[in-house]
């Protein structure tokens, strides 16, 4: 494997001159630059990325910290981030935090030590104080952290209200909500939207709200109990599509037909929701665009460009599948 010294010898220049050509820093005459570039090509020399990052204190690498890579929403987000980064010759470093604050803090410290250029994070545990004095720029994705941390998210509150209204229009009279974890901002906003639409209904009871933790298995378990104890429920708003799948599994096990006896609507618009039978009705986020927008925003900050807008809030769209149709 060719080294920088081999290139210097072939081009009959110093190692320092080769370094200036590689890093495009300092003065090098045009003739010398061509000699060095020719030597690099003929020797098939690949600059050491670690050494360059130490020299330049940057690595052309972005870290994406996600809470649960098993949730199909997050790989779709990651694809949007990565595709944008690839157009700018940045590399993506993927980190899975499991909603663990210690892991998130450790990742934040790691990216500073490794000269990672910036971080896109989906977190419900870190606060502005955890971000404030970091040496790398941070963009919050899906779950805003605070006014001073740039963010990309959707209108969860309004989207959940639309979801419940759709269930009402499908003829549902008793609508339950399988919510996500407590103290997770998007989960809380979707819960508030549901409550706004049904809280004053004469039939409403808080027993119609259970927590599925954004987990398909947990959701199937709590939905089994919910429907067994409250057979009058004829509509369920699941806090995300992943949980909507758990709802449908529970309905199958109980012999409840979807949508003839139970209407189900999710939130997110993940591709997997289109592969279920019946196909899930959902409030679709522009998932891919969320990832691309977060990456574009972060790169503008890293490159010192003018940032006219620090917080992006996208609207969601009703995608009528087959889980809310009534004969």
Model-derived segments and spans:
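Amphipathic helical "hinge" segments at domain boundaries
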Residues: 45-110, 114-117, 192-195
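N-terminal helix-turn-helix DNA-binding module of bacterial transcription factors
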Residues: 1-59, 73, 245, 325
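Acidic (Asp/Glu)-rich catalytic clusters
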Residues: 129-135
């Amino acid at each position: 494997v060719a080294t920088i010294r081999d290139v210097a010898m072939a081009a009959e220049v110093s190692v320092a001159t080769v370094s200036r050509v590689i890093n495009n820093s300092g003065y090098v005459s045009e003739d010398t630059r061509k000699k060095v570039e020719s030597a690099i090509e003929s020797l098939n020399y690949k600059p050491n990325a670690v050494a360059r990052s130490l020299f330049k204190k940057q690595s052309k690498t972005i870290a994406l910290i996600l809470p649960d890579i098993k949730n199909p929403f997050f790989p779709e987000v990651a694809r949007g981030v990565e595709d944008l980064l690839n157009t700018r010759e940045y590399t993506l470093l993927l980190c899975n935090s499991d909603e663990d604050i210690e892991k998130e803090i450790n990742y934040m410290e790691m990216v500073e030590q490794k000269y990672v250029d910036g971080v896109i994070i989906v977190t419900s545990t870190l606060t502005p104080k955890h971000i404030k004095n970091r040496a790398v720029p941070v963009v919050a994705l899906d779950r805003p952290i605070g006014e001073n941390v740039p963010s990309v998210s959707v209108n969860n509150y309004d989207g959940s209200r639309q979801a419940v209204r759709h269930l009402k229009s499908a003829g549902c009279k008793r609508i339950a909500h399988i919510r996500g974890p407590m103290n997770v901002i998007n989960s809380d906003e979707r819960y508030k939207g549901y409550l706004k639409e049904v809280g004053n209904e004469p039939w409403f009871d808080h027993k119609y709200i259970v927590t599925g933790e954004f987990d398909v298995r947990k959701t199937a378990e709590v939905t089994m109990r919910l429907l067994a104890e409250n057979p009058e429920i004829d509509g369920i708003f699941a806090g995300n599509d992943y949980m909507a799948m758990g709802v449908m599994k529970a309905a199958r096990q109980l012999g409840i037909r979807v949508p003839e006896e139970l209407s189900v609507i999710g939130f997110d618009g993940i591709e997997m929701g289109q592969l279920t039978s019946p196909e899930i009705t959902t409030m679709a986020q522009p998932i891919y665009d969320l990832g691309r927008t977060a990456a574009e925003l972060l790169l503008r900050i890293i490159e010192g460009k003018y940032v006219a807008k620090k917080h992006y809030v996208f609207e969601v769209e009703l995608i009528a599948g087959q889980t809310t149709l009534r004969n």
